[in-house]
Regions:
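Membrane-interface extramembranous regions at the lipid-water interface
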Residues: 1-122, 127, 150-184, 192-224
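Extracellular-loop-to-transmembrane junctions of the mid-late helices
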Residues: 136-153
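Helix-boundary and loop/linker segments of multi-pass membrane transporters
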Residues: 130-136
């Protein structure tokens, strides 16, 4: 019974995470389209959109914060709990760790990049010698961090979806995993996000169904 309670708690935490991710994606899409519409078409129009752009920027930052909370505040602990029930999910928990490490490295790369431009005084002529080396270092750090986070993303979402399907036999998990894979392929041609958003919806629905089945099975007394 204790193990089943941990399992249900883990799935509920994961479900909350995918809900937060979905909301974050929607907010991000709204903000992105808002930026496109709000782009001023002349000097006189610029002043009129400053407030709108500021609002959309705040919305975008909130979406990013919500996505980070979803991954590291919900999905990461959910995978950790689930790995206590089924050790096969340990790889998914490790994936969230790689995403965290990759994010930290990317942030460090951004800091180095900002320091390089600050040292150069934003002057192209100053970007020589050691400054150029610093720029190469910053870009290298960003690339490494991005690759680590990307690998973690695959381990968490793609592998996670397929492992959930293998354990609970709900085809929606499989469908979500396939959508995640296809969207990664589309990323190579500059199109990303739509199929992943649908995958989040499928994961949310599938997790709800699994939780209901496990809860019902727990509440139903065993037949003698």
């Amino acid at each position: 019974m204790e193990t089943r309670n941990v399992e249900i708690s883990a799935l509920r935490t994961l479900r909350d995470g995918f809900l937060y991710l979905l909301v974050a994606v929607i907010m991000g899409i709204v903000a992105a389209f808002g930026f496109i519409v709000a782009v001023p078409h002349g000097p006189s129009a610029f002043a009129g959109v400053v407030g709108t752009v500021a609002t959309l920027l705040i919305m975008l930052l909130v979406a990013v914060g919500m996505a980070l909370y979803a991954i590291f505040g919900k999905i990461r602990p959910g995978m950790r709990q689930l790995s206590e029930v089924d050790n096969g999910f340990r790889i998914c928990y490790t994936g969230t760790t790689l995403m965290l490490v990759g994010l930290v490295i990317v942030v460090l790369g951004i800091i180095v990049l900002a320091a390089v431009f600050a040292a150069a005084g934003f002057s192209p002529e100053a970007l020589r010698g050691t400054v150029v080396s610093g720029l190469d270092l910053a870009l290298g750090v960003l690339l490494i961090g991005g690759i680590i986070a990307f690998i973690g993303h695959i381990m968490t979402f793609v592998v996670g979806a397929f492992k959930l399907h293998g354990k609970y036999q709900n085809s929606l998990y499989m469908a979500a995993g396939i959508l995640f894979v296809v969207d990664i392929v589309l990323l190579l041609v500059g199109i990303y996000g739509i199929l992943t958003s649908v995958g989040y919806i499928l994961m949310y629905i599938a997790l709800g169904d699994t939780i209901n089945r496990l809860t019902t099975a727990t509440a139903t007394p065993a037949q003698v």
